[in-house]
């Protein structure tokens, strides 16, 4: 089936869609023929993407505000007459820090965005999705399953998103609504760049991120977008699924360890582009 017809005539809401993974997902659904609602607090970024993507509209929404979420869904159904898919992508990754340096208030705020925002949109969208026998795709993360050094609040909130996905999949199966999640690994996005800039050595942080995957590079937002379109369309017998889009990082054997076992190294002064494989030299 041609990519432009895979989800033709369907209506998709993508939160946190103004940039990064969310923008990649929005682009992929537009390419598949869907009508896409770009949802974000960032009006400038959302409007810019709306101008870029034919078949997309921007609606400003803060997913931590239930009244905003209600308005988002009401406006979407009023404009398009239906709702077929919701992608809960809005979220944040705070800077890494030891647990003793975190605060309960900061944790609560992260829960409001990463978990309760997803919960609220799911709850309010289900009446529409039951009518269309649609589906929800929640964006979790690899570290929700394997943990993250000095990233306890983030890993905890995203791990809860995965658990929420599985529980909702059971509840909604009686209505023919599927609920799945995607757990990305290192995806090269503006957020990744911002977090790397906070590291003592940003170039080394980027290199380490790229080398964490057996495929030897970071992923791209378009690759997460392709996974989302697959879950919404062809994956009609999948529900409660956690789909890892990680370059194999969860296997625990990135190329740096492999090259070392062969007596090779990544050229230390060379930081490869995050989405391409690095140059290799000999230790000898």
Curated annotation (Swiss-Prot):
Stated pH dependence: Optimum pH is 8.5 to 10.0.
GO cellular component, one term: cytosol
Keywords tagged on the record: Carbohydrate metabolism, Fucose metabolism, NAD, Oxidoreductase
Catalytic activity: L-fucose + NAD(+) = L-fucono-1,5-lactone + NADH + H(+); D-arabinose + NAD(+) = D-arabinono-1,5-lactone + NADH + H(+); L-galactose + NAD(+) = L-galactono-1,5-lactone + NADH + H(+)
Residues that bind NAD(+): 19, 21, 40-41, 62-63, 89, 154, 158, 187, 189, 191
Domain of life from the UniProt record: Eukaryota
Pathway(s) the chain acts in: Carbohydrate degradation; L-fucose degradation
EC number(s) given by UniProt: 1.1.1.122
InterPro entries on file: NAD(P)-bd_dom_sf, SDR_fam
A GO term, aspect molecular function: D-threo-aldose 1-dehydrogenase activity
Family that this chain belongs to: Belongs to the short-chain dehydrogenases/reductases (SDR) family.
Function: Catalyzes the NAD(+)-dependent oxidation of L-fucose, yielding L-fucono-1,5-lactone, which rapidly converts spontaneously to L-fucone-1,4-lactone. Can also act on D-arabinose and L-galactose, with lower catalytic efficiency. Does not use NADPH. May be the initial enzyme of the putative L-fucose degradation pathway in mammals.
Protein name: L-fucose dehydrogenase
Organism: Oryctolagus cuniculus (Rabbit)
């Amino acid at each position: 089936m041609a990519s432009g017809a895979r989800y033709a005539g369907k209506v998709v809401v993508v939160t946190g869609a103004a940039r990064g993974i969310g923008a990649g997902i929005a682009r992929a659904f537009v390419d598949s023929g869907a009508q896409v609602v770009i949802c974000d607090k960032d009006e400038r970024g959302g409007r810019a993407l709306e101008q870029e993507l034919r078949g997309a509209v921007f609606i400003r929404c803060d997913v931590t505000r239930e009244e905003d979420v209600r308005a988002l869904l009401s406006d979407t159904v009023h404009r398009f007459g239906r709702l077929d898919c919701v992608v809960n992508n809005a979220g944040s990754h705070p800077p890494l820090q030891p647990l003793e340096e975190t605060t309960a208030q900061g944790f609560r705020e992260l829960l409001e965005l990463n978990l309760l925002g997803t919960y609220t949109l799911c709850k309010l969208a289900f009446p529409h999705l039951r009518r269309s026998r649609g589906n929800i795709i929640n964006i979790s993360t690899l570290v929700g399953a394997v943990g993250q050094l000095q990233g306890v609040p983030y890993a905890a909130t995203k791990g809860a998103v995965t658990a929420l996905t599985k529980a909702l999949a059971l509840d909604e199966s009686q209505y023919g609504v599927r609920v799945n999640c995607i757990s990305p690994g290192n995806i090269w996005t503006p957020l990744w760049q911002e977090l790397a800039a906070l590291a003592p050595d940003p170039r080394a942080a980027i290199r380490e991120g790229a080398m964490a995957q057996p495929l030897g590079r970071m992923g791209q937002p378009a690759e997460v977008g392709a996974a989302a379109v697959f879950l919404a369309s062809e994956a009609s017998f999948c529900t409660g699924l956690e789909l890892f889009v990680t370059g194999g990082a969860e296997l625990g054997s990135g190329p740096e360890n492999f090259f070392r076992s062969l007596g090779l190294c990544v050229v230390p002064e060379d930081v490869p582009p995050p989405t391409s494989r690095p140059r290799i030299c000999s230790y000898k």
